[in-house]
Amino acid sequence: MIKETDLENIPDLLIKFNEPLSNYTYTKVGGPADILAFPATIEALTELSAKAKATDTPVTVLGNASNLIVRDGGIRGVVILLEKLDSVKVAGYTIEAQAGAKLKEVTQVAQANSLTGFEFACGIPGSIGGAVFMNAGAYGGEIYQVLVSCKVMDAAGNVSVLSASEMQFGYRHSVIRDKNLIVLSAKFELQAGDPTQIQNEMDRLNFLRESKQPLEYPSCGSVFKRPVGHFAGQLIQEAKLQGQRIGGVEVSKKHAGFMVNVADGNATDYEKLIALVIEKVKENSGVTLEPEVRIIGEK
């Protein structure tokens, strides 16, 4: 296991020990990380990864911790948050953003540069790295539609660039997930557009989001993938599960596809409620819901 002394001389690296991950997740749940690291440069990330590998220390990389549940026992080893790697560069019709850049900010950069095609992501509460990891999408748009290439690092510290076809995108899936790669940055190809029209479309999508989703409570976003031929929220409604509560977590009364932390809930509450919803929806409709949210850590 990596020691504190192994990390002291890595420049541009902020370290916290036994840090509650509930301070960083959108659900406001999650036990402690043994070591929580915030690299501010690719070099710091590379050196940290190399030292973790040399000491057989497990590494977990989190995006913006939005579509994520960290269990109450926390995460052993090193947890890396990439929020300090957040640069965004524009060249012509191309935007290149580091993994820690927030989707909302990248869409604002696109609008300011009269670039259209990224509006669908304006309200997704995630980072570029997390969005690429799971091929995030909303309102008919998905990351795969605009991504050109992605710079990644493997567990050995090797950096490579994957083309869009090499990313093997699927519904809420990419090769990043399969091969345990770290997204460093992503390049997107957009089109020329009118900045006023782009802003109007973003305003429209944000209004839809705010009117239909329970943004006033901590949540992990959409809990379940969309089953073929159905909508998860509708199936949950039909099973009369809206308002169903376990501990401090309940199925949102505003949008059945969300589970909200209404009263200091924990990850165990989330997992129990997810299991209950899967069971009851299966009984009612015959459809087996599959979680979209990523659940990690120790119980």
Curated annotation (Swiss-Prot):
EC number assigned by the record: 1.3.1.98
Active site feature: 172, 222 (proton donor), 292
Domain FAD-binding PCMH-type: 28-193
Cited SUPFAM superfamilies: FAD-binding/transporter-associated domain-like (SSF56176), Uridine diphospho-N-Acetylenolpyruvylglucosamine reductase, MurB, C-terminal domain (SSF56194)
Cofactors demanded by this protein: FAD
Enzyme superclass (EC): oxidoreductase
Pfam families noted in UniProt: FAD_binding_4, MurB_C
Keywords: Cell cycle, Cell division, Cell shape, Cell wall biogenesis/degradation, Cytoplasm, FAD, Flavoprotein, NADP, Oxidoreductase, Peptidoglycan synthesis
Pathway membership: Cell wall biogenesis; peptidoglycan biosynthesis
Any Gene Ontology biological process: cell division
Main localization category: cytoplasm
Catalytic activity: UDP-N-acetyl-alpha-D-muramate + NADP(+) = UDP-N-acetyl-3-O-(1-carboxyvinyl)-alpha-D-glucosamine + NADPH + H(+)
Cellular component aspect of the GO annotation: cytosol
GO molecular function terms attached to this record: FAD binding; UDP-N-acetylmuramate dehydrogenase activity
Compartmental location: Cytoplasm
HAMAP family assigned to the protein according to its UniProt record, in alphabetical order: MurB
Similarity comment text for this entry: Belongs to the MurB family.
NCBIfam families xrefs: murB, PRK13905.1
Record function comment: Cell wall formation.
This protein's name: UDP-N-acetylenolpyruvoylglucosamine reductase
Species this protein is from: Lactococcus lactis subsp. cremoris (strain SK11)
